[in-house]
Amino acid sequence: MALPVNKRVPKILFILFVVAFCVYLVPRVAINFFYYPDDKIYGPDPWSAESVEFTAKDGTRLQGWFIPSSTGPADNAIATIIHAHGNAGNMSAHWPLVSWLPERNFNVFMFDYRGFGKSKGTPSQAGLLDDTQSAINVVRHRSDVNPQRLVLFGQSIGGANILAVIGQGDREGIRAVILDSTFASYATIANQMIPGSGYLLDESYSGENYIASVSPIPLLLIHGKADHVIPWQHSEKLYSLAKEPKRLILIPDGEHIDAFSDRHGDVYREQMVNFILSALNPQN
C-alpha cells in the first residue's frame, strides 16, 4: 500500500538530505586521504634560514624559509631556487634534499603549503596552487634576490603545483623548471591510492594539461624507475607532452624523490646544477 503524500514527503526529503550530505562529504574525506601534512619537527632549522611569514591570495597565513647562498651575498647568487615540496611532512622533512644548494651559490626559498608545518588552513588543490603562486611572488619582491634569475623546483605534488602556476601564465623571471618524481594526472594517482576515487579530484589542476606551456623555459624531468609511490611512466608521459627545450633523466635504482639525497651523492646534483647553468646561459 502506497504511503500517503504527507508521509512520503519527509522520507523523500530525508533521502535527498543524505544524498546531498554524501556529495558534500565524500570529496572532503578523499582529500584528507590524499594529503599527508603534519607539524612534526624533523630536524633543526637551517642555521642561516630567515623565517618568512606571508599570506596567500585568499588570506591564508603561510610559513617559509629563505636560505641565502653560503658562498657570498644573496644578491650575487647564481639564481634563487623556489622549492615546492612533496605531499607529506613539511619543509623541515624536505630540507635535506635541497641543503646542498646554498654551498653551490644558490639561494633557496622553501615554504609549507596550507595545513603543513606552521602554515594555517586546510590543503586543497586550489589552495596549494594559490600557495605556490604566492610563494613565487614573495621571492620576486625581495630586495636581495635577482627577480630575473628564478628556478622552480617541484618534487612530487610540488611539481604539479608548479606546472599549474605556469599554466596560469605566471612566467616572469623563471629561467628553468625542474620536476622530480611528479605525476601527470591527479585522477590516476588518486585511483592508485583509493580505487575509484579519481573522479573526486579536479583534473583541471593536473600537470599534463600545462606541461606544453613551459616552453621555451628549459625543462628538466627526473624520476626513479624504482619509485613505488609515483610510477616513473608519469614523467615519461609528461616528457612526451612537453615541448623543447626539455630533458628527461631516469634513474635505474631511483626511489621516490631521492635523486638529490645522499644515497646518490653528487651524481644528479651536478647534473641539475649544469642544467641550470645552461638554462641561464643558453649561448654557451
Curated annotation (Swiss-Prot):
Predominant location? membrane
Q: What is the membrane topology noted in the UniProt record heading this document? A: Single-pass membrane protein
Cellular location of this protein?
Answer: Membrane
Q: What's in the keyword line of the UniProt record?
A: Membrane, Transmembrane, Transmembrane helix
Q: A Gene Ontology CC term for this entry?
A: membrane
**What Pfam families does the record tag this protein with?**
Hydrolase_4
Q: Which family does it belong to?
A: Belongs to the serine esterase family.
This protein's name: Uncharacterized protein YfhR
